[in-house]
Structure formats: structure tokens, C-alpha cells
């Protein structure tokens, strides 16, 4: 079975995904969507994203294999799987036999996985927000919108890859 790699993110109208290690907005419907989508699947994140989650939840994301990409794996708790490369992250996820693995941030990790992603699930916010972290630039000619669910202040949009980023 081939594992699908999906990037999932909430992105402001100006591309912002974070500010000072936090998400600069609160939309409960989006958090519910994130949880319902990722529970039971491996999630890959960078160390700073993990630290933000650990601060908010007092631990890793529950009911998910938390794979943390870091240069200092010895500094992470045993409750997560620490890896030092994207290849190792994908291998750990594949070992879980999950059909889909979700990349959940931050910006550098999204950028590293974008070329190999099969799917993007983006919460596209109508408003712009101040922040210091942005989603990487996407070549939209490689992606097709497959599904859109519109809410009052955002839309959840699923895109699938139609061609490779590497030419």
C-alpha cells in the first residue's frame, strides 16, 4: 500500500501561518476539522511546532504518532518519535501502516515536504493577519482543487497534485 503525504495548514489571506510561535487566530471549527482529519494518523512537524503544541496541550497531540523533525533529538521526550531527516520521518510514518501521513508545520517543514506532497488541505482564511511565519510559495499549476467547504470566515480546500514540482 502506498502512503499518501498530505500537508495540512491554516493560511491567512496574506500567507501568514504563525506569529511568535503561535497561531494568530482562533477558529474552533478549523481546530475540529484538524483533529477529525489527523486523529489516528502520523503527524510530522518541526521542533518549534511541537514545542507550541506541548505548551498548549501539556504534551504531544493525542491519538496520533507524533514525528518531530529536529537537529537535537536527544532533547525531546520519549512520547514523540524524533528524527533528523525528512527521509527518516517518512520511514517512521510508513512503518505505522497508516494510509495518510499529515505534515503539520512549521514553515520550514512544509517547504521540505511540499515537493513530495500528494495533497494539500488548506484552511484559507478570508482575513490577513500579522505574523512572522508564512506558508511556502506553491506553484498552483501543479495542483487541482478537489473539494471546498466554505465557512463564514474561511474555506477548507483540498488540492491534489496533478504534476511534479521538479522539472
Curated annotation (Swiss-Prot):
Pfam families xrefs: DHFR_1
Coiled-coil residues: none
Known catalytic reactions: (6S)-5,6,7,8-tetrahydrofolate + NADP(+) = 7,8-dihydrofolate + NADPH + H(+)
InterPro entries found in the cross-reference section: DHFR, DHFR-like_dom_sf, DHFR_CS, DHFR_dom
Protein keywords: NADP, One-carbon metabolism, Oxidoreductase, Plasmid
Protein's recorded name: Dihydrofolate reductase 2
GO cellular component annotations of the record: cytosol
PROSITE patterns: DHFR_1 (PS00075), DHFR_2 (PS51330)
One record GO biological process: dihydrofolate metabolic process
Matching SUPFAM superfamilies: Dihydrofolate reductase-like
Domain DHFR, residue spans: 4-167
Protein function: Key enzyme in folate metabolism. Catalyzes an essential reaction for de novo glycine and purine synthesis, and for DNA precursor synthesis.
EC main group: oxidoreductase
Enzyme Commission number(s): 1.5.1.3
Family: Belongs to the dihydrofolate reductase family.
Pathway named in the protein's UniProt entry: Cofactor biosynthesis; tetrahydrofolate biosynthesis; 5,6,7,8-tetrahydrofolate from 7,8-dihydrofolate: step 1/1
Record GO terms (molecular function): dihydrofolate reductase activity; NADP binding
Highest taxon in the source lineage: Archaea
Amino acid at each position: 500500500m502506498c502512503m499518501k503525504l498530505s500537508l495540512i495548514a491554516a493560511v491567512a489571506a496574506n500567507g501568514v501561518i504563525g506569529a511568535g510561535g503561535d497561531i494568530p487566530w482562533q477558529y474552533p471549527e478549523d481546530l475540529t476539522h484538524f483533529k477529525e482529519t489527523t486523529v489516528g494518523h502520523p503527524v510530522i512537524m518541526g521542533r518549534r511546532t511541537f514545542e507550541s503544541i506541548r505548551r498548549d496541550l501539556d504534551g504531544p497531540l493525542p491519538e496520533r504518532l507524533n514525528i518531530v523533525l529536529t537537529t537535537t533529538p536527544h532533547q525531546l521526550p520519549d512520547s514523540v518519535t524524533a528524527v533528523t531527516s525528512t527521509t527518516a520521518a517518512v520511514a517512521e510514518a510508513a512503518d505505522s501502516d497508516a494510509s495518510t501521513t499529515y505534515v503539520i508545520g512549521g514553515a520550514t517543514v512544509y517547504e521540505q515536504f511540499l515537493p513530495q506532497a500528494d495533497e494539500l488541505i488548506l484552511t484559507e482564511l478570508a482575513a490577513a493577519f500579522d505574523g512572522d511565519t508564512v506558508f511556502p510559495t506553491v506553484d498552483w499549476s501543479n495542483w487541482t482543487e478537489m473539494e471546498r467547504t466554505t465557512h463564514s470566515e474561511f474555506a477548507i480546500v483540498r488540492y491534489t497534485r496533478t504534476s511534479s514540482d521538479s522539472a
